[in-house]
UniProtKB/Swiss-Prot annotation:
This is Serine/threonine-protein kinase RCK1. Residues 502-512 are annotated as: Calmodulin-binding. Gene3D superfamilies: Transferase(Phosphotransferase) domain 1. SUPFAM superfamilies: Protein kinase-like (PK-like). InterPro entries: Kinase-like_dom_sf, Prot_kinase_dom, Protein_kinase_ATP_BS, Ser/Thr_kinase_AS. The active site is at 259 (proton acceptor). The gene is RCK1. Keywords: ATP-binding, Calmodulin-binding, Kinase, Nucleotide-binding, Serine/threonine-protein kinase, Transferase. ATP binds at residues 127-135, 152. One of its GO terms (molecular function) is protein serine kinase activity. It comes from Saccharomyces cerevisiae (strain ATCC 204508 / S288c). Its EC number is 2.7.11.1. Residues 121-414 form the Protein kinase domain.
Amino acid sequence: MSVNPEFIADGIDFYPTTPDAAYFNAADGKNKVNRINGNSENLHHSFASGCRRSSLSVDFNVTSSDSEKSEQSCLENNSQEDEYFCDIFSTELKLDETSNKSTDYSSSNHQYPEQLELHNYKLLNKIGEGAFSRVFKAVGINTDDQAPVAIKAIIKKGISSDAILKGNDRIQGSSRKKVLNEVAIHKLVSKNNPHCTKFIAFQESANYYYLVTELVTGGEIFDRIVQLTCFSEDLARHVITQVAIAIKHMHYMGIVHRDVKPENLLFEPIPFYGLDGDMQKEDEFTLGVGGGGIGLVKLMDFGLAKKLRNNTAKTPCGTIEYVASEVFTSKRYSMKVDMWSIGCVLFTLLCGYPPFYEKNEKTLLKKISRGDYEFLAPWWDNISSGAKNAVTHLLEVDPNKRYDIDDFLNDPWLNSYDCLKDSNSNSYASVQSILNDSFDERAETLHCALSCQSEKQDDTEFSRSESSEYIFMTEEDRNLRGSWIGEPKECFTLDLATSSIYRRRKNKIFFW
């Protein structure tokens, strides 16, 4: 098979500004980043200095026009996604309306041009930048809620322009339909799902699209890997379990993410509590709380997510180091591409470098297609056989033999030590023991554990009532257990009136 990969920047990615890892963006014509050096002695250094991957659509022997037509056809023919659009924009601007009006913010001399057409929010500072977008920390105007949010401003002229040729790299803006698809899916999957970044609002003006989401205060899991080199098995399990719960929630609804990677995992920070007054090691794992500063983990960036029809998709896309082999070797692929990506993430968490790395792109694709990776010494010497077994089942080249999401959540290693355990309890509530409960019960068990130590620090009745949220799931939705098969009969909804109620702690926000 002849593979001729080309990379197409999707143009609406979140590029966080961090001092810990180098990356290049498509705006500078450098959308290809340095790959990990094949010399195993330099693995961690290479990963830290040049391995940040932007979200790229990977086009393997598929013309951009054919790929675009395929995606557009699926969107236009999918009445349920049209319903999502109607639901999202019912209280916002209509799809065909734009506005040249500026916000009512008093100053006319704005620091950021994006502020001129933005309503109801004040941009405070830039926290990220992409080829056709910038991300800002912002606060609401004329509202009692002053909690900061993240706003991604996507410039229209950037995403509607024709393909721009940069040497051998082809950079193409995303269509308006793709932006609306991202918004629709983000709103749907984040509803009552604590492990996806929360969608707040969407605005469209004459020159920009604005996506308003929650501000996740800890940063990327990628940066913690760079800082800590690698995670302990307990900490890796703590992170990957939450990622799996987020993917489970999406797969319930027939949605595949297609870009799971450390750069797309954010976390809420937790403080370090030393023993007997001594500061603990930064990467030490605390039962029921977390470690490495990592508490609640959230999946972000739904620009490549898609609601599947007939349980399969055919558009090749993703981030090459984390993309499953069938994406570029088969005509169609299933939700199990997310499981491959989870395997790549778990591998990276445990040893500090990804399973597939190669300077030459064709060689890299061949390695992925063969599942050619190794548990190299010394990084894997002290990692348990259970962890290696979980990785092996996730990085199975044959998708029919690969773990699905339920297989992974039932994996013995994932259940051998429980990051969901409440440290007040002497018993373990393992993932396996609660799989027969609803999604929100599993998530709530985790939140109870994560919040336990915070509750001890601030145990007043006022703080408990003011800093809590509720997670809901209807009794009718309990039949969604197990792997998703077929199209949902109706939109996946969680109804307040008929739900079981679960309370979780929400930590106060301190950011940048």
